[in-house]
């Protein structure tokens, strides 16, 4: 198994270079299986887009914490890596029945930096306490690898462009000796448009896509000495648009532009654990994004959109 370090969008962006809506695929020549490949790519983009949203968002917005900080000015910084097992399809060989075989399986990790800041300590028992939430997503750009490009308006830091997330966590009740802390949270995350290829420079295909995510979470957490435990559930909405162009042959339908709207929602659940050593905490998470039957016409070996997907997170926290 290989390991790769990618932006969530880059997990499936190569697919989008051949993707189009069904009617757009009809304009592509059927010779050599080009139209069948296009239709399979459409299904793959629909299937894998929520996985990109999942690995961007993770589960708990503050690993191993179920409630708010409980005091104004408290700060928690988390250096986090989300990941999942990605089944990479081989679109060069599609069976007559529409089955796409798996080319490889990779562990796809995505780095995120997150912050929690106490704003309001709340009323009695922590009710209506408020924490501000923030995140920074690291997105490779043209300085990271040849052929990549990122939104020119995106904030850049050397070889990466930055995507940002903002939100809030509201306390329901504080933790006591006999009960866990409870909280609700909402976050909005945005990954800048990222792409590769340039048909004007001689490439056969080019593609770019963006991703926006809304994350709603309900969490509970408890501490037992050094041990931190939290669990929760939530709902995500992912949206974006993929644009592309292709110049694959001189035949009619061998050149053109495409645009594919992407809009999906998913439920998920997660369990966290951690060890606290003063201001340092080692944390982890395992979660599950529930599947949705999208009635795909293509079967992808190793992937079932109705079965859901498991994701993982590891994090190092600093609390002040």
Per-segment meaning from a language model:
Residues 177-267, 272:
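Detector for outer-membrane/organellar transmembrane beta-barrel domains
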């Amino acid at each position: 198994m290989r390991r790769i370090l990618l932006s969530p969008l880059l997990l499936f962006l190569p697919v989008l270079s051949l993707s189009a809506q069904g009617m757009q695929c009809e304009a592509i020549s059927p010779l050599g299986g080009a139209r069948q490949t296009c239709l399979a790519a459409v299904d793959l983009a629909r299937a894998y887009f929520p996985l990109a949203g999942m690995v961007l968002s993770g589960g708990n917005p503050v690993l191993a914490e179920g409630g708010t900080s409980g005091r104004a000015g408290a700060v928690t910084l988390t250096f986090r890596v989300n990941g999942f097992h990605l089944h990479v399809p081989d679109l060069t060989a599609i069976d007559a029945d529409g089955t796409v075989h798996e080319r490889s399986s990779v562990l796809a990790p995505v780095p995120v930096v997150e912050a929690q800041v106490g704003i309001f300590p709340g009323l009695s028992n922590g009710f209506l306490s408020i924490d501000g939430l923030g995140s920074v997503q690291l997105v490779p750009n043209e300085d990271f690898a040849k052929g990549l490009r990122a939104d020119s308006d995106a904030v850049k830091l050397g070889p990466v462009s930055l995507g940002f997330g903002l939100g809030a966590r509201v306390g329901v009740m504080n933790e006591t000796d006999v009960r866990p802390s409870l909280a609700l949270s909402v976050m909005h995350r945005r990954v800048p448009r990222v792409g590769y290829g340039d048909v004007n420079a001689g490439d056969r295909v080019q593609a770019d896509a963006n991703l926006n995510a809304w994350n709603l979470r309900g969490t509970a957490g408890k501490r037992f000495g050094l041990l931190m435990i939290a669990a929760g559930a939530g709902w995500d909405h992912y949206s974006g648009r993929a644009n592309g162009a292709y110049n694959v042959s001189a035949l009619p339908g061998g050149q053109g532009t495409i645009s594919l709207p992407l809009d999906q929602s998913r439920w998920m659940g997660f369990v966290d654990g951690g060890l606290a050593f003063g201001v340092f905490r080692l944390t982890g998470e395992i979660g599950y994004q529930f599947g949705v039957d999208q009635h795909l016409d293509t079967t992808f070996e190793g992937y079932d959109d109705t079965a859901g997907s498991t994701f993982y997170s590891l994090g190092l926290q600093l609390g002040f």
